[in-house]
Curated annotation (Swiss-Prot):
Subunit structure: May interact with ERFE.
Highest taxon of the lineage: Eukaryota
Stretches with biased composition (Low complexity): 105-129
Signal sequence residues: 1-24
C1q domain mapped to chain residues: 154-290
SMART domains: C1Q
Organism: Mus musculus
Name this polypeptide is given: Complement C1q tumor necrosis factor-related protein 2
Biased composition (Basic and acidic residues): 75-87
Pro residues bias (residue ranges): 50-59
């Protein structure tokens, strides 16, 4: 028989033992019940009596079958940080790293002290000639020189020039520089300043023929800062020519030039393949008794 059947049989016997006194209770008289109550032992179906003393421990049972491994538990909370450990020994030097990129340029340092003077260097090559300086002030008239040799039959003193421009639209109220020399007899015209400077006192004739385009033209002939003649020509959309001429009595050192006398009316036009603008002057005759006259 199996253990289960043994246990079932034992329980059945216990229940049967409890049921027999209860079944006999109706058949017993009052006498019999009184005897039971007075001194007889209590039956199972009567009221429970006091708890009896514990029985002796039973023999240990056999070990059960090992159960399955449970699921892993959840991670517990992190513990507090431990105390800092002692410093370890210094390790061996590492390998040399790659060269870094060049850093930004630093600020200029303070100027250092002047070093000792070096030896004299080799002489350099001569430089280019500088631009001509400004014309100096006119000097005092010198004393008369000794009489020169006779030049009977020779011509009188000469002074004549004819010049042209090489740029368009000159600035107003300044001498126009006619820098293309066609003739400069005696060298009395200064191309750098645009002025004719009288060296032979006498009567002179001056004339000009100016080409204009795209702008109006207001030009005048100036003698020692004063306008002697003025010419105005309006722009018609085509090339045009403005002309003027006069005769002047000049003394030694007098200056004559052309200039624009009104703002934004400087229509003088230069075209090397089409037209020229000319300024011309020459001596008609010198004053009597002039030392330059032969």
């Amino acid at each position: 028989m199996t253990i289960f059947k043994k246990v079932t049989t034992m329980i059945s016997w216990v229940l049967l033992a409890c049921a027999l006194p209860c079944a006999a209770d109706p058949m017993l008289g009052a006498f019999a019940r009184r005897d039971f109550q007075k001194g007889g032992p209590q039956l199972v179906c009567s009221l429970p009596g006091p708890q009896g003393p514990p029985g002796p421990p039973g023999a240990p049972g056999s070990s059960g079958v090992v159960g399955r491994m449970g699921f892993p538990g959840k991670d517990g909370q992190d513990g507090q940080d431990g105390d800092r450990g002692d410093s370890g020994e210094e390790g061996p030097p590492g390998r040399t790293g790659n060269r870094g990129k060049q850093g930004p340029k630093g600020k200029a340092g303070a100027i250092g002290r002047a070093g000792p003077r070096g030896p004299k260097g080799v002489s350099g090559t001569p430089g280019k000639h500088g631009t001509p300086g400004k014309k100096g002030p006119k000097g005092k008239k010198g004393e008369p020189g000794l009489p020169g040799p006779c030049s009977c039959g020779s011509s009188r003193a000469k002074s004549a020039f004819s010049v042209a421009v090489t740029k368009s639209y000159p600035r107003e109220r300044l001498p126009i520089k006619f820098d293309k020399i066609l003739m400069n007899e005696g060298g009395h015209y200064n191309a750098s300043s645009g002025k004719f400077v009288c060296s032979v006192p006498g009567i002179y004739y001056f004339t000009y023929d100016i080409t204009l385009a795209n702008k109006h033209l207001a030009i005048g002939l100036v003698h020692n800062g004063q306008y002697r003649i003025r010419t105005f020509d309006a722009n018609t959309g085509n090339h045009d020519v403005a002309s003027g001429s006069t005769i002047l009595a000049l003394k030694e050192g007098d200056e004559v030039w052309l200039q624009i006398f009104y703002s934004e009316q400087n229509g003088l036009f230069y075209d090397p393949y089409w037209t020229d603008s000319l300024f011309t002057g020459f001596l008609i005759y010198a004053d009597q008794g002039d030392p330059n006259e032969v």
